[in-house]
């Protein structure tokens, strides 16, 4: 019975340790959004876009605005 409980505990700990994997997927998605914003001539800001810029999208995961200067 003790072995079964120990095995169950180990399995629970292994399966609950998915947070770093989710965190790394988030950062991969963030890099992709950031690159997409920069490739289109934009930049990510923490606040709102200045009046001389428009907002073509957002930067993943924090939903920061992606601003691009109007021509």
From Swiss-Prot:
The gene is Defb2. Kidney, uterus and to a lesser extent in heart. It comes from Mus musculus. Residues 1-20 form the signal peptide. Belongs to the beta-defensin family. Has bactericidal activity. This is Beta-defensin 2. Induction: In tracheal epithelium, by lipopolysaccharide or inflammation. It holds the Pfam family Defensin_beta.
């Amino acid at each position: 019975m003790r072995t079964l409980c120990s095995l169950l505990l180990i399995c629970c700990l292994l399966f609950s340790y998915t947070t770093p994997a989710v965190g790394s997927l988030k950062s991969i998605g963030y890099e992709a959004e950031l690159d997409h914003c920069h490739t289109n001539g934009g930049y990510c800001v923490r606040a709102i876009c200045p009046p001389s810029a428009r907002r073509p999208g957002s930067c993943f995961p924090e939903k920061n605005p992606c601003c691009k200067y109007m021509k």
